[in-house]
Amino acid sequence: KEAGCRFCGACIEVCPTGSIMDQVKIMKENRSMAENIVPCQSACPAHIDIPRYIRYIREGEFDKAAAVIREKVPFPETLGSICNHACEGECKRNELDAPLSVCRLKRAAAANESGAWKERVRREPATGKKAAVMGAGPAGLTAAYYLAKKGHEVTVFEKNPKAGGQCRYGIPAYRLPDRLLDREIHTILEAGIELRTNTQPQSPDQLLKQGYDTVLVAVGTHKGTRLPIEGSGLPQVYVNTDFLKQARLGTPLPLSGRVMVLGGGNV
């Protein structure tokens, strides 16, 4: 059936007679074999095995699908809500009709899994090594999660009251609800990670002197960029990141009278 074709082009490569012709140029000359065969996975920054977890979803195996996603990222439901899904832009189904909804499928896998995958998570024996992570945003927590699975003792330091980084303080709750983010952070910490909020180490050297074997700096990019125009530094001209963070903290910046917003994107 035509609808059953994922438009991956694999049949062209393995056909022993050459009878299957690449008439629409599925295989691009300027791409590697991996990029041609599974372009969605190649386009994904985390290189998640997208075809495999979609196959599990189709079979109703949501736990297996979630486990495949968590091989690469510990935030499947968060990504399913806010990912910019570069994979969909490279989906071979674009050549036929429309791309698969990879991002929403990722969220469906995370929302419907039972948590049974936790029983099968492999954790290597304790190494005796201590790792410190500065910043409890998505990068810091992801690193902490996989370091813990490697058997290292991990402590995460976060200067804000709660973990989450830009996911919590830079994205409005209507796009990424706190309950969803809290649930995934809780799952990450269950790997045996210690989280210290409202704590800001002076420097990586300070942590090394305290006995940590290695330090990862994952403080994020919370500083916004002002437009290079006259008056951008005047009082009551606010940068988007500052405004969003203060709003999420419940202390919005003072506004009155007429308000102008420069920029028509999501922010």
Whereabouts are the PLM-identified features?
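Ferredoxin-like iron-sulfur electron-transfer modules
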Residues: 1-7, 20-43, 64-85, 117-134, ...
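Iron-sulfur cluster-binding cysteine motifs and their immediate structural context
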Residues: 10-27, 39-59, 80-109, 155, ...
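Short amphipathic alpha-helical segments
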Residues: 55, 145-146, 168-169, 227-231
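N-terminal Rossmann-like dinucleotide/flavin-binding domain of flavoprotein oxidoreductases
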Residues: 66-73, 84, 105, 166-212
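Extreme N-terminal leader/targeting segments of oxidoreductases
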Residues: 93-129, 183, 210, 237-240
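Rossmann-like dinucleotide/flavin-binding elements
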Residues: 134-157, 196-211, 223-225, 242-267
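Glycine-rich FAD pyrophosphate-binding loop
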Residues: 152-168
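Glycine-rich beta-alpha-beta "Rossmann" dinucleotide-binding loop(s) and their flanking helix/strand
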Residues: 215-217, 221-244
